[in-house]
Amino acid sequence: MCLLMYCLLRPCFQTSFRLASKIKLKYVCICIGLIMILDFFGAFTHFLEITYDSKFVYPYEGDVHEFVNALRHNEKPDVDPINEYNYTYKIDIRQKCEDAAYSSFRVVYIVKSALEHFERRMAIRNTWGFEKRFFDVPSRTIFVVGVHQEDNELQAKLEMEAAKYKDIVQADFRDMYYNNTIKTMISFKWLVKYCQNSKFYMFVDDDMYVSVRNVLRFIRNPANYPDYLKEPKKIGAHKREIKDSDKTEELGINNSITQTNSITLNKNDSLVRENLKDTLTTNEINHKLTQDFNNETLNSITVINTNSLMKKISDQAEIVRNETNLQRRKKQIFDFELPEDVRLFAGFVFVSSPHRHKSSKWYVSLSEYPYHLWPTYITTGAYILSKEALLEMYYTSMYTKHFRFDDIFLGLVAKKADIEPFHCEEFHFYKKDYTKFNYKYVITSHGYGNPNELLNVWNEQKALGNA
């Protein structure tokens, strides 16, 4: 009986087993595929990240200030540098910052350029890179490039350009996106070695619009830019308010009285003159003074009205003094000058997380960087460094492990150097929509890789007084 049941049910069991095996294999394959997809997009990696907090460390692990200070004073540090960019300069212009006419420069512009971008460099020379944009503000523009392997024709063309314009520095590293940190630090090294006589240094990609005028305005008063430029309008509005609200009733005095009393106004008291102009236009007193009045009556009226006039002048003079004091207080903002030892690292500041999906151009593995956040950093399309910040960050970089993304690397260096990146909205890391009148306070805008577009926009803004 049992044997009979087995024979009858065996085909059913075999069919069920085969079906279950197929279903099980299907789900196993689906699960494996899902795991691979999640891993590709970094889902599991995020769970393994270390929290970025006050205990953050990045090689070299430890305080580096003492070592940096030793290097800056040409002394041997207790710990040797762990990261130096020892590349050879194929094209050098070490005399670029030596000029008998200028002992120092206000700004040196360092343009990170690709070797083949000849037209972009030419457009920059003819716009914001023109070194005599303002005759009373000495500046220099320097292009930094790498090399292309086995492209002798391109190299020869670059050498001709360098010989003609004498504004190109070339080092023997491969010019590619993932070597931007090398390009940046080669620039730092060259500046520290050959061009320390500038108060500020601006690093810019060769596809950026730059307003030289706004750069100079910004470095004059970074904390209040661009608001402090709007103050004169406020002062002007205040003047008009005083003029309208404090105008008293007409005194009714004719010109003869003012001439008789020989009232003299200071040339600078334009506000008094303006307010008195309306006050001294009526001839009401002529209606009051008839020929029947005797000299005593006339003298009495003259004294009364003269006293009233003098009080008016006194009141208006007080307004002028108040306005002058107000303007002087405002002018202190305009004339603000950063101290020589300020450590300014300014641009558009970001706080973001590493890209963990492997398809990303900016993918970073846990072995490269294990934390869930980057240190605060500045997008490196355009940023400004004071001389002190440049020196401090250059020597600190020698104790910072190399990282292939230059903006992140400089963020790591700044954190080690205890330099807080300074944020300004007018450094546009994207291409700001252009209209004729919305670039008034723009310092930089990305997306101007077309030389003709840069020329057109920059020249239009220059004509408006914004570039």
Indicate where each model-derived feature is located.
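Secretory-pathway lumenal glyco-enzymes, predominantly type II signal-anchor Golgi glycosyltransferases
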Residues: 2-467
